[in-house]
Amino acid sequence: VNAIDGNKFETINPATGKKLCAVAKCNHKDVNLAVKVSRKAFNSGVWSKSSPEHRKEVLLKFAELLRKHGDENSVLESVDTGKLITDCINEVANDAPMHFQWYGELIDKVFGKVGPTEPSITSLIVKEPIGVVAGIVPWNFPLMMAVWKMAPALAAGCSVIIKPAEDTPLTAIRVAQIGKEAGIPDGVLNVLPGYGDVGEALGRHKDVDAVSFTGSTEVGGYFLKYSSESNLKPVALEMGGKSPFIVLED
């Protein structure tokens, strides 16, 4: 789907410096539309109120299709990130399907509880999907990080909006297409490629119920600010870098 304004940006193979393709450049208008669609899907109950057995079936199908398209997705990840194809095969073809399978298998094994009370009182602890969840994904593990955010939220019955890094949007878009093939209903899983303004719009949106962010410590702090200035949505933060390396002239 094109961005509302029709804008696009190029994604580059960092190993060659050559253009791969043009991708929709989303902005706050697209965020508003995606949140509206996600909320409508959530409120309809088409996914949020579907049976655990149905969600399990769809997520296991999702895992199966990710395995089926593992080689294709690994190549796509490699050319979009510049990573070794061997690394991409391990992450994309092996680990990503495993995560969807794990959460799919978990769905019908998590239950509510009856709290201890006196005989005249009944206390029930019920697990419910929080609503519309935004996942902000970095460039270093684009598909894996997207899956880590998608799978548990979808398993719980939430609607999910993924904002991939502008450097590496391709596999997140492809995974959303595979999700539709697996049976994820329209509006339940959305991907918004674009720049930092898209992440900020998601963080500030009052109809986004939770944010999961992976990225720098500085930008993670912004999301706490966005939450405090909007609807106090819960924000899960995975911040900071590790494993630096030194490149010498020779």
Which residues fall in each region the model found?
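Glycine-rich loop-to-alpha-helix module at the N-terminal edge of alpha/beta enzyme cores
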Residues: 20-110
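Hydrophobic face of amphipathic alpha-helices that form TPR/SEL1-like repeat modules
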Residues: 1-16, 22, 41
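Hydrophobic alpha-helical segments that mediate membrane insertion or helix-helix packing
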Residues: 17, 55, 153-154
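Short, glycine/acidic-enriched loop or turn micro-motifs at the edges of active sites
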Residues: 16, 25, 166
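Short acidic (Asp/Glu) and glycine-rich catalytic loops that position anionic groups and cofactors
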Residues: 13-18, 76, 237
